[in-house]
Amino acid sequence: MGKYRTKGSIALIITGSVLILVLTGLYWGRNGILCRMVGKRILRTEQKYGLSIRYDALRMKGLNEIELSNLSVVPDKRDTLLTLHALNMRLSFWKLLRGKIEVRNVTADRLKVSFIKADSTANYDFLFLKKEQEVPAGSAQTDYAHRVNRILNLLYGFLPENGTLRQVDVSERKDRNFVAIRIPQLSIRQNHFNSDIEVQEDSVRQHWTTCGEVNRSHHTLKAELYAQHKEKIALPYLKRRFGADIRLDTLTYSLTESEGNSGQIILTGQAAVNGLEVYHKALSPQTVNLDRGQISYRVLVGKEFAELDSTTLVQFNQMQLHPYLKAEKREHQWHFTAALNKSWFPANELFGSLPKGLFSNLEGIKTDGELSYHFLLDVDFALPDSLKLESELKERNFRIVKYGATDLGKMSEEFIYTAYENGQPVRTFPIGPSWEHFTPLDSISPLLQMSVMQSEDGAFYYHRGFLPDAMREALIQDLKVKRFARGGSTITMQLVKNVFLNRNKNIARKLEEALIVWLIETERL
């Protein structure tokens, strides 16, 4: 028995000695192993994207600390994309043993990223290269929950609990225009971060401040952005690239990830904006102002779908809504569902919350009574003819107390009409008996009246300004031909468009048209 114990002890000692020797060898050779691993990755990346990636030194300090100096990334025959003077990262040792990367502390100095485009050549073209080998249809299934989980795990893994980033510069230049964002120092202490941000777009300079929290253990992200000296934040690049001018006072955001049933991911959080001003010609010819907007959201992500739960609360000014959205991919075809139901609420909550600049004719309108609203849009792109569209705004004891900027009842008597072309007034004349070309309805042939009615709006006497079936058929046709090919306007809608609205084709005009039509039909103006 003693002999076996002796042999076992000897075997244990030998195994332990070998293990110590191996670990010692790995420790002393860790820099060589690290450089070889990184070198292989760099070589593959260089060959795949046509880059030149260089650094002066890469080494490990201890068992979990990495130092890198003078890194540069230069695309072939392009301007330098990235330079980094020095980087020090301390990783989680136990996570590293399991093959996972979790950054505990990071210090970076003089990180500079430059996106440069001259004519049609850019130093970031490689980012948009198509993959050489496409995955055959049906060979793999998309798992959106898995994708979201991987992205968030990567994000939380690389965002440190503590760290300092000094002199971070990110710039974009196209010909003579440029945007430069500079962070003098970003400090992260016990999951909380704060920093000043200097922004310059061409000759315009701004000074922002950001702060927030990144909590890896709770999978939570919080951030706040505001301008210094009580100025508005003007988001750069968007005006030059998309023609959109967006300004705001403050922006806050939070995100928390949790696990649901059957491998689903639940994302909850809030986003809020104060003092928002938006201009884009496709939205409205005037700047749209939103005093306060907020969303408390709950998003469920599954293997083949993403869903905005109806417990989500959207608030703009006085109005509160609970929308429902779902996008699902079935056999490589999308299926979208959108729904909104709001039970009886004071009518002036809606009309008093309309963003300024979006509905110019209705600004200042005062109403009384109650409203309720139901909306449903269900689109299966595999079966476009099955499309469902329901929209109904009901009223109870509703009345207009005071008109806004425009008298919606002016068509009850003679009024002055101005015709516009390309946004410019071309002619002004009265609509009524005083105009020499005015023709009363009873002087027009009943056959002509019926012909116009049947060709334009056969159900004119039976609806209240809207034909949901006509809108549904028009939307189905547009989806089939993949363009706006058919309209679903009633005569009332065409009348409102010509009398009250301009010819600008934008989202605001269509929404304002619908509201004015409903008011005219409901109040019999």
Residue ranges and their predicted role:
Residues T6, T80, G465:
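Short amphipathic alpha-helical segments
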Residues M1-G8:
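N-terminal Lys/Arg-rich, disordered targeting/topogenic segments
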Residues I42-Q47, L91, K95, L155, ...:
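Hydrophobic, Leu/Ile/Phe/Ala-enriched alpha-helical segments that form helix-helix packing faces
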Residues S171-N191:
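Short, solvent-exposed loop/hinge segments that bridge or flank secondary-structure elements
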Residues D56-S171, P184, D196-E224, P236, ...:
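Flexible beta-edge/linker motif
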Residues V103, V148-E161, I181-L186, E198-L525:
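Juxtamembrane regions of bacterial inner-membrane/periplasmic proteins
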Residues G8-V74:
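N-terminal amphipathic/hydrophobic interface segments
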Residues L51-Y55, M89, Y253, T367:
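Generic structural motif
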